Structures are given as C-alpha cells and as structure tokens.
Amino acid sequence: MRLIAENLTLERGGRRLFADLSFTADAGEALVVTGPNGAGKSSLLRGLAGFLAFATGGVRLEGGATQASLQEQTHYLGHADALKSALTAAENLGFWAGMLGGGAADVAPALARLGLPHVADFPVRALSAGQKRRVALARLIVALRPLWLLDEPTTALDVGAQALFAGVMRAHLETGGIIVAATHAPLGLEGAKSVKLEGAPLGVGEAA
C-alpha cells in the first residue's frame, strides 16, 4: 500500500500556502509535517482528508481496498476532540465505532489501550483535557482504517499518555498502516519521514 501525493497546490483566502508539493508514504511509514504557524500544516491534512480542494495535483492510495474511496480508508483527527459532553466516554466511542465501521466490542479494548478503562462510564464533561484527548484518540482504534491523518495529536497529553499513544501509533505502522501527522512536538516515531512547510517551495527528506 502506498499513499501518493503529486504536485499539490493549496490556496486559502487568496493566499497560496504551498505549491507543487509531492510525497509518498508506504505501508508501515510515518510522515511528519512540520513548519511555522500559518504554513499550511492543518490545511494539508484537511486537503488529504477531502475537506479542502487542492488547486492543482491529486492524492491516491494504491493497494488499499479496491471498492473503497480514499476517505473511507482514512481516519482524520483534528484539533477538536469531536465528543459529546453529555455522553460517557464509552457512549462517545460507541457512536464513532458505528459511524466508522467498527463494533461495540471494540470500545472497551480501545479505552484500555489509551489507559482509560476507569472512565468508560464517566460523562465526557467530567474528564480532564488530557483524558478527553485520549478518548478522541481511541477513535482511531475502534474501527480499522489504514491511513491516519493526525493534526497535533498529542495536544493536552502528559508524558505518560504521549508514550501510550506512541505505542498505539507504532502498532498501527507494524500492521502496515500509514500515518501523516502535523506536529510541533516529537511523536516518538523513529525513522519517520518529514515534510517541512515554509509557505514557499518545500523540501521532503528524512527526519533526524
């Protein structure tokens, strides 16, 4: 499986964020998008997810499910946690499991992998910011999708939770998944490729 982006140009509000951006990510690879605020990191992810239209270029996933669209094979996690505050953690994940093609049996294991089995029956409004973020991250594993698009996924996470999520990401890569993540902070993914956005022609290379 391979994610291929070719000659991507994105404009917003009359401003060109980037132009002629091309990259690939193979099964088992992570691609980390870096750059200053306003360089277009979030917009790139939203374009890959199909929420924004690129002015030029295209994106495709080769070797995935032949009858499914790119979006149907993608998990997108943005800045917002996308949780209902009145519902419990388990109820929120149950909703997303149904929406994304998972099942109710996947909810408890997903919470456990993020260190949250004890909050399953707590309303989300009673959780801390870090716990809410972990519930949102658990959405990635209640339904199997090969491509993960993650925008600042470790926001509000403490060191321990960051380590837990790094393990989740590594497990996804080990099973042949692909991750594209925009971040200002290290994600604990050794050997990840990098794309640096600067609001001008970009470079793609290996992360240090």
Regions found by a protein language model. Name each.
Residues 104-120:
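Conserved ABC ATPase "signature" region
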